[in-house]
Amino acid sequence: MLKQELLNRKLPPLKSQEEMIEILQREEYGYLPENDFEISVANEKIIERRFDKGNVFLSSVEFTLKNRNGSHTFPVYRLLHQDGGKHPVIICINFDKLVSNKYFPIEELSETEYDIITYCYTDITSDDGDFTTGIAPLVFPNGRQNATDCGKIGLWAFANMRVLDYVLTLDGTDPKNVAILGHSRLGKTALFTGMMDKRFGFVFSNNSGCSGAAIARGGSGLPDSEGNFAVEKPFRGETIEVITRVFPYWFCENYKKYAKQNYGTDFDQHYLLAAIAPRNVCVNTAELDYWADQKSEQLCCLAASQAWERLGLCGIEESDSYLKGGEKLFKGNIGVFMTPTMHFLSRHAWQGYMEFMRIHRHN
């Protein structure tokens, strides 16, 4: 059933990794800025020592990015083991300025083998069309000038990459096992980050939907040739027309030209996942998150699978039916699972990502 459904979507065939990365930068997310930044870290503060019987500390540092146009500092929080060993790391770009929040179950995370790095995305630059906040004026001192200049997703992704520069200097980091994780718009950001930076061995997308891990062609937000929708209101998936009208500043200006047709003639979102191969990708889709179009997210994983198969690897685990809440496909290098939740980075999701990473951890 799924393979036939995928054929019905009439997706463009995968291209070379270099071509797919170029297309997605030029037409959707924009080109990342030149890395002419210096990084500095200061004022380490221990916030809590009691986690895991004192073996895990929660601390913060002031993280500064500086170039010829100025500097910007934002707090980075670290949940780090103190046992002297090497640990896999999950870098989570977060929605909340408070480190203990609904997206970050800190007590549970502290009891795992993972070191966790987190920070608030709006501390990097604001989530709006203002390109004079945070690192934006350091990248665009005269504002965005070109239709291919990156939007806010690109700036958040660039900051993720600079935080990784720092994380790789920490003694406890296992450099082969570092993941980037984000939810919703930050799930799109995590995927773009992972595509652009091969140092991330794992890329985790949570409910990223339209312009993230959901293919656009034939999605539930689009009518068929007779004007009928596959899913009736209010359960229709988001479209490029909607997202570029409401959140145009997330993307480069070029992306707006696809609003009416809802996809590029020579690309769709399976390119975003495929360009990460041969590294590991895990996509969570939520049972009640119709806006993210769960079926199109699972089909995107299936469409991208060929990129791994061409390299002699297993892409997505074989399945011919859509997932139900609580089900998962974790045997392949593309993992996909469905949490029995709404649009949310839940404990179920965190547990799923950590399980997938344990299965595929690099030695």
Language model features: what each stretch is:
Residues 1-73, 361:
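N-terminal targeting or regulatory segments adjacent to alpha/beta-hydrolase or S9 domains
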Residues 68-74, 80-90, 112:
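Proline/glycine-enriched tight loop/beta-turn segments at coil->beta junctions
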Residues 85-162, 166-169, 209-218:
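Cap/lid segment of the alpha/beta-hydrolase catalytic domain
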Residues 173-184:
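Alpha/beta-hydrolase fold nucleophile elbow
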Residues 182-194:
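Glycine-rich nucleophile elbow surrounding the catalytic serine of serine-hydrolase chemistry
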Residues 205-272, 297-319:
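Mobile cap/lid helix-loop segments that gate and shape the active-site cleft of serine hydrolases
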Residues 246, 295, 302-363:
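C-terminal catalytic histidine-bearing segment of alpha/beta-hydrolase fold enzymes
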Residues 277-294, 339-341:
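Conserved strand-to-loop "acid loop" that flanks and positions the catalytic carboxylate
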